[in-house]
Amino acid sequence: MDTPTPQSRLDTLAAAYWEAYLETYPLFATSVGDRRYDDRLADPSDAGVAGARARFAALQDEADSLGADALGAVPLDEADAPGGPDRPGGAPELDAAARVTLDALRESVSADIAQLDAGLLAWNIDPIEGVPVDFLNVPDYQRLQSPADGHHMVARWCAMAAYTDEHLASLRRSLADGRVACRAPADRTTAILAEILGTPTEDWPLLAPLAGLDALPGWSPVERERFAAALWAAVNDEIRPAFARLHDALVTEILPAARPAERPGMCHVEGGLEGYRGLIRVHTSLDLDAGELHRIGLDEIARIDSELGELAGRTLGTRSLEDALAALRGDPALYFTTRDETYEKAASSLARATDAIPAWFGRLPEAPCEIVRMGPHEEVHSTIAYYRQPAPDGSRPGQYYLNTSSPRTKPRYEAEALAYHESIPGHHLQIAIGQELPHLPEFRRHLGPTAFFEGWGLYAERLADEMGLYTGDLDRIGVLSFDAWRAARLVVDTGMHALGWPRDRAIAFMHAHTALAPDNIANEIDRYIVLPGQALAYKTGQLEMLRLRTEARVALGAGFDIRDFHDTLLGSGALALPALRGIVSAWVEHRTPGSASTPSS
């Protein structure tokens, strides 16, 4: 038997990692169109988490072994940038493109392990991505076409009850060990549970698939009747009681012992500070400490405050940041009045961006983007917007989910920047392009560091101004407010989780430096409490992308082409920031007069 080549080993390993990831996270598998796990959920038990970690650790060991063999024992993060000369003493048997894949795989597996080691699953109560909201959104993307799909759906719905009970058991075990969630976001989850439990079962989102059942071909009357009865029983007899048990336990057991608003951060949980350090690496893809990120945030806030003062002087008649923010928050004319207005503004912004992108990007996605209003079960306690990737098989477009609740609290001047971040040229453009790169292994089409995804979204907000997409100076004030918002995240996330800030101090900092509405600020701070480190990705990624663009423009001069630069940034999938720098450096070198190298991905 022939000895496997490094390339064949890498191909096998990349496929094995993708399979392990889909099996570990079945809801993600469904969201990207893989239907094999539509009947199950992730295993949140201690044994399930340990099993997932063991799978990822075995893959990490294999990737490290391959790296040592293929790169002549040169650690991958010390190897030359793609397209550059080989290191002395290390004769790589993987070409530059394959080395990027190996680097990405090691980065991704390491992040998976760090996420599990942080231990959040055991004690965290997440009103944004946890029970029950995560489950209530599943009908939006789980397919129901055939009777077999119906069997899978019923099985998964029943698994939701078991998952909820296991989640409660974990919360109780953690409470006994002295690890407990922060009160403020836990209150939000309790309110969401109370709201859904107060809703008649027939109106639950989990029964929405029944509305279109009669129109589905290939079902006999008996199959329709059995499925409808089984789905109803799963929701009414399994999930509803499980949600009620969780709600009651939160009220009587967890909330009375929850950490107060004075101690919201991971640093107040045993082992939390170490876990937070790991999450910084996960979300930024860089070896930065909390203090350094905190300082970067403060520096960015100072710069943006100055820019905002100058623009406010021209637009609002005051250069005082405090007065400008008060004017932005206090003028009802600057806010929407109806839900439809909020939606229509997003739609018109998306349409303008769609028309403009061919001048700025050579590669465009085939998948379209649509705007979807958040459902009532999530909008009150959710963020202002989020994005869901398209189904790779074309059955679902990319979706920009918009929170249209309480329109009088939603500023008009922020709506355009929000749309460009979530849709085009932001998340939709980047994620849809990544999914449509046929030369990449599956995991690179769908996974990647938060710093790349969110860094691109924030980069896109500023790019939209260069593209001429903003209507006026008030909308540009919205851009600066959003930029300050992301810079403030560096300050408040590290402030709470590493430096011990109370929740009120984080809220006050956001209020002093952004034009965000008070309700939005409170929602955001509670989001950072339950998703530690995630908020660090935005500014970290944006700043690196801006640096790369500036360096490339200086190096290439008149030879710099913005379309080629953007195609280079997005043409290799979502990469760790050091790997992205290597890709851009190779592209610049290839275009430098006299260079014989070629770019790679």
Tell me what each language-model feature is.
Residues M1-S601:
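N-terminal maturation segment of proteins
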